[in-house]
């Protein structure tokens, strides 16, 4: 790793370069944000080849690889699943793992989530500005600046481009098996100063099978909510039908009173022969459900005041309201684990599904670093069994832990302190899941600064241009420190000659 004096000298040159390149850096990020890279169905290109995450994700990937080639970097496209932009020589590699895919935009934005561009006030706006296109582009411009000022890293610097981080993360695993692991590095996909621990992640579904009902009365025709399991849902919707449409007036009045009493907005409107009921919440990252307002919980709380012809539907709604509801710590399902290292478990319901066969929810748990996933499931099962609820395990990511005095953690902490002047900051444990779990020797480093508004997975995501430029500086310093400077053989000989005189 480079010494502090080397970091200071090269950082000064980089600072001047950033000042000259600020407009280009902002425009490149705005262009990347304009590509709506939400994962979609695979797109066939030719026999035996496809874009596994859809056209838009591939477009964002192609854009970054094009920028890399234009800057004179080596690039790699690993079967359209992941890739990298790289410069420098050396046997070892510093890896920076970032991702180009984004979660769905959702509703309620004050500006277009993909085409808002840069505001007159200097805000770079749109989905991905914080998570993770802004940090990714900041690392790219740090690399570009270092190359253009003549920095020669002793280790290769590799910006690894993930394409499905928000869903399975399988693309990165595919890439790492073929390209190999970097020796050390970081991912700019969390918050500052440094994340030395990440809670474990469980994704699973809870569902109840539905029997046919021959009764007549208020029928639940449709029920849905949420776009992704790792997002607090911002909206949810039900469609109900009655053989006596006059009953809709009573339902609408109940909805009005519910909203007035609870403070949760509900909207009702006639839709053909049915009545639509829509709940509005506040989206947030699924790892911090307490920062959002769950629209699924709002909708089911209201539907609990109605009685449907299918008693299994009524029982599911009662189960949800009593054992999940608005709680975000899993206490209703007897899984409110916590520890001194990482704090409390968090519980998010991200999606709601319904058809004539079953009704269910997709859930996301972030559990303490000293727990095991099976402990969580074992704790929940007695409650689930009592209500005839089925559980389907989807994904599990075990916790990540580095000691606070680990050399990598300490090096990145020092970079952060030098840049910000914050000598009181300490390494953190996060509920978020990052690529650091898949890549030993890496931790999350930024990109959200303490005190800044966290808009990740939320509407109106944006970053100030000044913060973005600061990210370029801080990541540039981190790359200088971690990669080290390759010594010119002639300089080494001069140093030996001086020592011998």
Region spans (language model):
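Acidic/His- and Gly-rich active-site-bordering loop/insert found
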Residues: 2-127, 148-153
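Predominant activation on well-ordered alpha-helical scaffold segments within soluble catalytic domains
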Residues: 30, 65, 137-144, 173, ...
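Short beta-strand-to-loop capping motifs
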Residues: 87, 208-210, 240-244, 279-281, ...
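Active-site metal-coordination/substrate-binding segment of hydrolases
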Residues: 93-161, 167, 183, 458-459, ...
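Acidic-glycine-rich active-site phosphate/pyrophosphate-binding loop
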Residues: 103-119, 207-214, 269-279, 414
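Acidic/histidine-rich catalytic neighborhood of metal-dependent amide-processing enzymes
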Residues: 132-211, 252, 256, 328-341
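A short core secondary-structure module
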Residues: 205, 211, 215-216, 231-243, ...
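An extended, acidic, His-containing surface patch that forms the Zn2+-binding/catalytic region
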Residues: 278-283, 287-356, 362, 366-378, ...
């Amino acid at each position: 790793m480079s010494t502090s004096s080397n970091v200071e000298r090269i950082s000064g040159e980089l600072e001047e370069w950033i000042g000259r390149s600020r407009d280009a850096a902002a425009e490149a990020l705005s262009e990347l944000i304009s590509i709506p890279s939400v994962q979609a169905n695979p797109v066939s290109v030719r026999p035996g080849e496809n874009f596994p995450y859809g056209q838009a994700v591939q477009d964002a990937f192609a854009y970054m690889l094009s920028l890399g080639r234009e800057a004179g970097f080596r690039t790699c496209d690993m079967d359209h699943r992941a890739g990298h932009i790289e410069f420098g020589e050396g046997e070892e590699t510093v890896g920076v793992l970032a991702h180009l895919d984004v979660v769905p935009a959702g509703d309620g934005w004050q500006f277009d989530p993909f085409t808002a561009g840069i505001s007159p006030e200097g805000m770079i706006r749109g989905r991905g500005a914080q998570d993770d296109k802004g940090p990714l582009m900041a690392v790219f411009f740090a690399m570009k600046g270092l190359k253009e000022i003549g920095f020669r890293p002793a280790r290769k610097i590799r910006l690894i481009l993930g394409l499905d981080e928000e869903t399975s993360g399988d693309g990165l695993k595919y890439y790492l098996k073929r390209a190999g692991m970097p020796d050390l590095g970081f991912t700019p996909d969390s918050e500052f100063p440094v994340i030395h621990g990440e809670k474990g992640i469980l994704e699973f579904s809870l569902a109840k099978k539905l029997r046919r009902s021959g009764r007549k009365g208020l029928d639940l025709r449709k029920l849905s909510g949420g776009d992704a399991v790792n997002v607090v849902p911002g909206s949810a919707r039900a469609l109900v039908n009655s053989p006596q449409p006059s009953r809709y007036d009573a339902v609408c009045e109940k909805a009005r009173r519910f909203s007035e009493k609870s403070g949760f907005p509900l909207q009702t409107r006639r839709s053909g022969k049915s009545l639509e009921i829509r709940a509005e919440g506040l989206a947030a990252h699924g790892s911090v459900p307490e920062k959002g307002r769950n629209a699924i919980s709002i909708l089911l709380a209201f539907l609990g005041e109605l009685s449907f012809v299918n008693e299994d539907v009524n029982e599911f709604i009662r189960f949800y309201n009593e054992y999940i509801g608005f709680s975000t710590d899993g206490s209703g399902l007897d899984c409110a684990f916590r520890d001194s290292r990482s704090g409390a478990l968090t519980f998010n319901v991200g999606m709601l599904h319904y058809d004539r066969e079953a009704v269910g929810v997709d859930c996301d748990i972030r559990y303490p670093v000293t727990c095991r996933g099976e402990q969580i499931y074992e704790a929940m099962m007695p409650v689930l069994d009592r209500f005839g609820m089925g559980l389907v395990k989807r994904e599990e990511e075990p916790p990540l832990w580095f000691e606070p005095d680990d050399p990598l953690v300490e090096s990145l902490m020092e970079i952060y302190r030098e840049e910000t002047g914050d000598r009181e900051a300490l390494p953190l444990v996060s509920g978020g899941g990052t690529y650091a779990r898949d890549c030993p020797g890496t931790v999350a480093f930024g990109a959200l600064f303490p005190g800044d508004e966290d808009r990740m997975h939320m509407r109106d995501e944006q970053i100030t241009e000044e913060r973005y430029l600061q990210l370029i500086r801080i990541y540039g310093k981190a790359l200088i420190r971690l990669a080290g400077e390759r010594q010119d053989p002639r300089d080494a000989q001069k140093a030996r000659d001086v020592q011998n005189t």
